[in-house]
Amino acid sequence: MALTKIFLILLLSLLGLYSETVKSQNCDCAPNLCCSQFGYCGTTADYCGSTCQSGPCRVGGPPTGAGLVGNIVTQIFFNNIINQAGNGCAGKSFYTRDSFINATNTFPSFANTVTRREIATMFAHFTYETGHFCYIEEINGASRVMCDQNNRQYPCAPAKSYHGRGPLLLSWNFNYGACGQSLGLDLLRQPELVSSNPVVAFRTALWFWMKSVRPVLNQGFGATIRAISGFDCDGRNLGGVNARIGYYRDYCGQLGLDPGANITC
């Protein structure tokens, strides 16, 4: 009789464990958590590693597009872009994949949740703004001081220019000021840091991206054009808009994605 009771207890325990395992495999993790092979949510390698089912999976996860940024922006992907810049381009010896990866490491909320579509979108804009990473700052930018003297929160420093610099051409004193404040850099007094340090350059682009572009990603590529360069939309610069779309389609193809809907503005 005692053996029968022990057997029943063990059987019920196993059934309970099985039930809990099945329940856990119905993974409904938060967007920032990975679903492990056993259906549990977490952020460590046990959850986001090679057996990850869904979420921001890392190496070897399912082909959902989510994963560490370095696994999406490979050296080949980066080289395919920058190699199209001419040999005389200043950016060709300035921008590197490593500097981009290092910059993303300072934005963990980006690096740990980025998708292939977001990379295709981002690098389409990088390509357009910099001419395949040819330009570090906007053409003839030094002739455009771009100082809003009415902005008292971020006053312009004497003899400094706030023309477009970096992969997304950070411009105007109020953007340099807010960006520098966020990054812990005095970009109001040293705006040239953006064009002399490639990691800083990419960090400024990521700052603008997280603030103004990522919030509209789910609206389609067209919404990101409007967020970055709204004055090009509504037929005002069809050539520029179509060029951005062309790069986006190209990178979607390289990353195995359909461009999706709402790609123009």
Swiss-Prot record:
Gene Ontology molecular functions: chitin binding; endochitinase activity
| Cross-referenced InterPro entries | Chitin-bd_1, Chitin-binding_1_CS, Endochitinase-like_sf, Glyco_hydro_19, Glyco_hydro_19_cat, Lysozyme-like_dom_sf
Checking Pfam families in the record gives: Chitin_bind_1 (PF00187), Glyco_hydro_19 (PF00182)
Active-site residues, as the UniProt record annotates them: 129 (proton donor)
Matching CDD domains: chitinase_GH19 (cd00325), ChtBD1 (cd00035)
Question: In which domain of life is the source organism classified?
Answer: Eukaryota
- A biological-process GO annotation: cell wall macromolecule catabolic process
Q: Where is this region: Catalytic?
A: 67-265
- Catalytic activities: Random endo-hydrolysis of N-acetyl-beta-D-glucosaminide (1->4)-beta-linkages in chitin and chitodextrins
Q: Where is the signal peptide?
A: 1-24
Keywords noted in UniProt: Carbohydrate metabolism, Chitin degradation, Chitin-binding, Disulfide bond, Glycoprotein, Glycosidase, Hydrolase, Plant defense, Polysaccharide degradation, Signal
Its family remark reads: Belongs to the glycosyl hydrolase 19 family. Chitinase class I subfamily.
**Protein name (record):** Endochitinase At2g43580
